[in-house]
Amino acid sequence: MPKLSFFQTPSTGGWGARTGAPATTTGTGAARVSGEQDMEVTPGPSDSVSAMAFSPTADMLAVASWDTYVRIYRIDKTNAQPVQPYQQYQHEGPVLDVCFNAEGNKVISGGADKVARCFDLNTNQPAVVAQHNEPIRCVRWLRAFGGALVTGSWDKTVKIWKIEPQPTLITSLDVPERVYAMDTIGLIIIVATAERKIVAFQCNEATGTAQQVAALDSPLKYQTRCIAALPEGDGFALGGTEGRVAVHYFHDPPDPKDGRMKKFAFRCHRRANADHPDVPRTETLLYPVNAIVFNSQGTFATGGGDGSISFWCKASRTRLKSTYFY
């Protein structure tokens, strides 16, 4: 059974903190996490965790798993006892993604059963709120249209839904390939698909539609693992299977002073021989970048398959800190 725990450290502000809290860092080196301050989850999911989402309004965490369940945990930082599921509900196949609505009173998940389900934390009842012809890979909450659900599927469509009072499809958008990753900010939806394609849509609340505003090939050479919208909504950060991140802008003319552009890419989540005893001296292990998250100040964190989380400053293009969990 996979082990799931909440790691507690002195607050670093913007990471998981309330909106507007300042982000701080403690150095540029790498630290290895001990288990002394973990809050263990018992029981944890019985299969791999596919996605997690924190509530925007409370100390709650939703966890989607390949064992077909979504588990919702209420975190009490004053209680040292193991954290147990507060609520849970089930899909008819592996659950691939999960999110909260803006008010934090609903958990929405999508999965291999081709539907999105909404669990109402006020009534403790799940309901189907969206459907596709193939598995739903991504779910995100959109603040446009008075609050709406966005679903991205392997059927090569992205759909926007009103889920109250009854589930209603607002619009369906075609994308070039199967949806692999997705994010939203303001009126913007950014989608990464198979075959290294990136598309962006801007919602029009007056007409109830969304128009494509960007279409490009990924700046990375290999398969996309994750994507995150920049806080200003003018671009995105993209993580790939080759241990590399690209920060890209929709409009990026050369600076008239030096000809430089704002976009950049960098290597991360890689281990050379000195870091890993199983790697030959002349080789480096490349790990996928599985998650990217920004705080409101523009610094961001990446989580990699090497078991580490790294913190980065977008403005100075530098790494602030890395933490290894195993």
Q: Positions of the model-derived regions?
A:
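A short helix->beta-strand "capping" segment at the edge of beta-propeller domains
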Residues: 6-10, 18-47, 81-83, 263-267
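Short coil/turn segments within WD40 beta-propeller repeats
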Residues: 47-50, 59, 67-71, 93-96, ...
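Conserved beta-strand element within WD40/beta-propeller blades
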Residues: 61-65, 107-111, 149-153, 189-193, ...
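WD40/WD-repeat beta-propeller blade N-cap
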Residues: 42-49, 88-95, 130-137, 173-179, ...
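Blade-loop segments of beta-propeller domains
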Residues: 81-107, 124-134
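Loop/turn segments within WD40 beta-propeller blades
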Residues: 52-58, 98-104, 139-147, 183-188, ...
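Short loop/turn segments that connect beta-strands within beta-propeller blades
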Residues: 75-78, 121-124, 163-166, 203-206, ...
